[in-house]
Regions:
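Canonical Radical SAM [4Fe-4S] cluster-binding loop centered on the CxxxCxxC motif
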Residues: 1-24
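Conserved, mostly hydrophobic/aromatic
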Residues: 2, 28, 46, 100
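Hydrophobic residues within beta-strands of alpha/beta enzymes
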Residues: 10, 42-46, 98, 171
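Structured mid-domain segments that build the active-site/substrate or prosthetic-cofactor binding neighborhood
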Residues: 12, 21, 25-29, 34, ...
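Short Fe-S-cluster ligation motifs
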Residues: 30-49
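Active-site-adjacent beta->alpha loops and helix N-cap segments on the catalytic face
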Residues: 52-58
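A structural motif corresponding to the C-terminal lobe/cap of the Radical SAM core domain
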Residues: 64-71, 75-255
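Radical SAM enzyme core and accessory elements
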Residues: 209-372
Length: 372
């Protein structure tokens, strides 16, 4: 099923999509471990229509706590909740790729689709995933009711920029089809459609032929989109004017050539610390060496060791934080919250605020201290 279940083009009228039932994390981990034991396979594809960020966070923590080593991928929505730190946590648990619907890369059409996302948001989430080493496949759509050729060309230009920036590695253009169980199919007149048939013939035969009062997508658009995508995936033609992919005349894209750069500049600070987040440490055990009033904190990393020198009380506080945030199966209680971290800091609130802006803190964050 799908926890969002609002997209107007999707068959959300069907029970198997609209009735989302989340599997408890403990039960899911048990199923994974059982399948590993039965098949000796450690690659998993989670087939939810869209997996909620909170559920994936819980799954990732459980996999790491129990040291269940798998490679996995699944379907998501480009939700703001997929922060850079959450994406790093997912990658640490074995996530190698995600698929998600961008559909039409047009904010006007995304509103009409009730996707609940924006094109800028999509770029930022894709960037967080890619920085964590997770591959991104985007579902794309053209020919949505009321979509203009200009909007289609603008969408293709945004997709081109996403590929240029390596924010998306794979994608596919689907032509819009009204279906019998979608909000559009259930109320076609409200969307400017006239259904031509056929009569409903069951679950597997639910595509509806239709006409839109403003006309249909011109012939040749689909072929140009298909042609462009085949080349983009191979890294070809990314510097070309997107109009060159079409055999028919198309308008000049109105999208700024620096759209992705500007969208990413508006990113919030890397998982900006807020009171309801918790600190999780995905690195190895820290070691502190005291040197008079100062101390050197060492933390092992995947490739190289990270070391920071701090006043001894701060080094001990940070070492305690990393120990408390370590992922381990015998853990009792929750991981330290941001409020608890701030209260335990050996200094004033102003000193704490200053400390988390220092390079030493950023180095520890980069080494594996996550706020999720």
């Amino acid at each position: 099923g799908c926890y969002w279940k609002q997209c107007t083009f999707c068959d959300v009228g069907l029970d198997y999509i609209s009735r989302y039932e989340i599997t408890p994390t403990k039960h899911l981990i048990g199923q994974i471990e059982r399948l590993i034991g039965e098949t000796d396979r450690r690659t998993f594809h989670f087939v939810d229509e869209a997996a909620p960020p909170a559920a994936l966070k819980s799954l990732a923590i459980a996999l790491l706590e129990r040291e269940v080593r798998i490679s996995w991928w699944g379907n998501i929505r480009f939700e703001k909740a997929f922060t850079p730190d959450l994406c790093r946590l997912l990658a640490a648990s074995g996530c190698i790729a995600v698929t998600a619907g961008l559909e039409a890369a047009s904010d006007r059409l995304l509103v009409k689709m009730k996707k609940g996302i924006t094109v800028d948001q999509t770029a930022r989430v894709a960037a967080a995933l890619r920085e964590a080493g997770i591959l991104v496949h985007a579902y794309l759509m053209y020919g949505f009711p009321s979509e203009t050729v200009q909007e289609t060309i603008d969408s293709l230009e945004r997709v081109r920029q996403l590929f240029c920036a390596d924010l998306v590695q794979s994608a596919f253009w689907h032509r819009f089809t009204a279906t019998a169980h979608s909000p559009i199919g259930l109320d076609p007149q409200a969307n400017g459609l006239r259904i031509l048939g056929p009569d409903f013939q069951g679950f597997a035969e639910n595509d509806l032929s239709h006409l839109h009062r403003k006309g249909q997508t011109p012939e040749g658009i689909g072929e140009g989109l298909r042609r462009s995508m085949l080349n983009f995936i191979e890294g070809r033609g990314l510097s070309m004017d997107v109009r060159a992919w079409f055999d028919i005349n198309t308008p000049r894209p109105r999208v700024s050539s620096t759209w992705t750069n500007r969208a990413l500049q508006k990113r919030r600070s890397d998982d900006a610390a807020v009171a309801d987040r918790h600190c999780i440490w995905i690195g190895g055990p820290p070691v502190v060496q005291t040197q008079g009033k100062r101390a050197r904190l060492y933390v092992p990393g995947g490739i190289k060791e990270t070391a920071v020198t701090l006043p001894a009380p701060q080094a001990m506080w940070l070492s305690d934080l990393l120990q408390e945030g370590r992922l381990r199966s015998e853990r009792e209680g929750s991981y330290p919250s941001w409020r608890e971290v701030r209260r335990a800091f050996p200094g004033s609130t102003a000193e704490f605020t200053s400390f988390v802006k220092q390079p030493s803190w950023e180095r520890i964050r980069a080494a594996g201290l996550l706020l999720v």
